[in-house]
């Protein structure tokens, strides 16, 4: 319950908390291991319209711009299929999960709206999720931020694949 300005107050004992803002029809925002003490004022948060899609198993098709995907188990792009991830998409991997691409992966980020592959953990650490394995032909990876994985891209036979402006951040190894 909020006041007329949308503010509210709640009493909690001092400690470390997962703080999460959610509203139906909007992408949630989380802060993990956030220290709350007496009279803590939290930052203002603006939730962006959109939905979070949980994925697991075989995937293909188009993941539209600005959406968020939670990878709950290993995902696979089957041979002969294509997964196209448009600019501004965030893909959050649960611990120990990853992607195997036997088909084609197109990551279509751009200068102003990159694609993000990251950990789903509220306080991410290197090695939180596995990696992306490429075995299909003609993958196209553009303007991707790839963070907190165990490894960078692995695989073989990814003939004709291109990588342009891929930023590896906070991974255990390349």
Describe these PLM feature segments.
Residues 1, 27-32:
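Surface-exposed loop/edge segments in extracytoplasmic proteins
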Residues 11-15, 34:
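Hydrophobic loop/turn residues within beta-sheet-rich immunoglobulin-like superfamily modules
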Residues 14-25:
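A short, solvent-exposed beta-strand micro-motif common in secreted/extracellular proteins
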Residues 31-35, 72-75:
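Beta-strand-rich interaction surfaces with strong enrichment in secreted/lumenal proteins
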Residues 4, 48-174:
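Beta-strand/loop edge motif enriched in small/polar residues
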Residues 8-10, 29, 41-43:
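Short strand-edge motifs at loop-to-beta-strand transitions and within beta-strands
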Residues 1-11:
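Short, acidic Ser/Thr/Gly-rich low-complexity loop/linker segments typical of extracellular
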Residues 33-52:
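Extracellular beta-sheet/turn segments enriched in Thr/Pro/Gly and aliphatic residues
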């Amino acid at each position: 319950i909020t006041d007329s300005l949308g503010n509210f107050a709640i009493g909690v004992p001092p400690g470390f908390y997962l703080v999460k803002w959610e509203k139906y029809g909007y992408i949630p925002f989380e802060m993990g291991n956030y220290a709350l003490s007496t009279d803590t004022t939290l930052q203002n948060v603006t939730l962006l319209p959109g939905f979070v899609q949980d994925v697991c198993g075989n995937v293909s098709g188009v993941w539209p711009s600005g959406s968020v995907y939670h990878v709950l188990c290993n995902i696979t792009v089957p041979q002969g299929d294509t997964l196209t991830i448009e600019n501004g998409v965030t893909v959050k991997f649960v611990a120990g999960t990853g992607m195997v691409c036997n088909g084609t992966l197109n990551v279509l980020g751009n200068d102003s709206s990159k694609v993000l592959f990251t950990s789903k953990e509220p306080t991410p650490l290197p090695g939180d999720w596995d990696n992306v394995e490429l075995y299909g032909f003609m993958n196209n990876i553009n303007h991707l931020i790839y963070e907190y994985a165990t490894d960078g891209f692995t695989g073989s036979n990814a003939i004709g694949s291109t990588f342009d402006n891929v930023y590896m951040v906070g991974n255990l190894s390349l």
